[in-house]
Amino acid sequence: MNSALIMQANLLLSLVICGLAQYVTGITAFLWLPFLLAIATLMLLPLQTRYSPLRLDYQEKVLLLYSGLLVLALLGTLLQQGGMVTIIGFKNELALSLLLPCLLLGFCRESQIYRIMKLVEWVFYLQIPVVLFQVLVVVPKRVAMRGEFEKWDSVVGTFGGDPMGGGNTGALGFFCLLVMLIKLSEFRHGLISRRSVAFHILAAFAICVLAEVKFVILLSPLLLAWVWLSPSYVRGMKSYDLKRLLLIALAMTALVAVAVMVLAASYSSAFEGAGQQGAIALFIDSLGYIFDPNHINPETGELGRVTTLFFWASNGDHHGLSNLLFGYGLNTTNHGSTLPGFLNPLFNVLLDSTSLSVLLWEVGLMGTLIFIALIVLLLWCCRPRPLLDRLLLSTADVRLLSYQPAFIAFGIACLLSLPYSQLLMLIPVQQFLFYFVLGAALVIRSSVRQATRSCEVS
């Protein structure tokens, strides 16, 4: 069985096919396809041919406790909401996490991860013409129909949405962030030229600016610095080169400054009646609602980012302490689902504006802590250490190992996004990227562990 082909099908279905199909037809039922393929992947796991015994160390065995979180979420939903809501909630929020245990248990080998990552690169190249089409054709059409103020979230690449109503710009931004991190790590390992890394980072950053993904724009310099300073599995890698680090810092600072000015000008043109505020002041003011503990959008009822935490702390025990600790069940906050959750009408607000809010309401404080703790443990145990001699490695081996610092940084970015966006709990594209990256990091870690054990034996 060619498991790499199955995982590549997961990738193309999640990142390209479903998004484009939904974007063109407006049919959201296409989003069931990644769920069905994830279930099929899990069912095919026992049929996987093993070329060596599966050996998990104690840290990897602890990660299998993730199944406990799934049981907690599914059983709590089934008892409180019934079978149909359980299926829909699992499909919307947790189904793609099945890819993580599949990869942990050996569904793909390291060579197959390498092939899949090459496909990720081609998916990025595909975004460029799609984004240009959306900028040159879709955005002007939408502005002409609905006005300058309605142009937000128009640039979504192949990640899906409504051409006239916005889409998954955040997921596009995170995908571009992953590409930036990978290319910088490859450059640091001496695998690509300065021209290549500059092209990929500039192209990815430009897409983030066009898509107006402020979170990625402001966070990317810190994560790129993390990748540059991170240790590697390859011995002899410098922890840092001060001159290059300063150049990268200056370049990223300049890029962020340009991005902020472009976004500020865009906001200024959209808010024509914004008084005497300057463009930069208007941009900074647009971020203010994020930290407002009492922000509620009067038109949509959507809570602000920080507001969601205060609102949960005040109302999370509405049906008792057990719901505060273990949640109300999956899908109970999802206002855009086939079966909308009952909590939004109950409180007359939208509770699913951030992934952290969704977790707290649906799996409770205990489930949220378990989820975050397991992801932190995974990132910690996958951190690279200099164990392998470069002279004994092929170029393909070094390239595969170079992915690990980028994967760790991307996982950190996704964790930091929990209190900011709903991507990780509600958007299949982001869910696939997150769980695949974590699973691939485990595969690379396992291959390094086996290689070092073989060297010790010999």
Indicate residue ranges for each PLM-predicted region.
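Loop-to-helix entry and N-terminal half of a specific, functionally important transmembrane alpha helix
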Residues: 8-16, 199, 361-362, 372, ...
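Aromatic-anchored transmembrane helix interface
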Residues: 60-71, 83-108, 115-124, 128
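Transmembrane signal-anchor hairpin modules in multi-pass inner-membrane enzymes, especially those
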Residues: 1-78, 84, 111-118, 185-195, ...
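Hydrophobic, aromatic-rich transmembrane alpha-helices
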Residues: 1-4, 37-51, 175-190, 312-314, ...
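Alpha-helical transmembrane segments of multi-pass inner-membrane proteins
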Residues: 117-144, 163-233
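A membrane-periplasm/extracellular boundary helix in multi-pass inner-membrane enzymes
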Residues: 228-294, 318-319
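Transmembrane alpha-helices of multi-pass inner-membrane enzymes
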Residues: 179-182, 405-458
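Long extracytoplasmic/lumenal interhelical loops at the membrane interface
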Residues: 141-146, 150, 296-366, 383-391
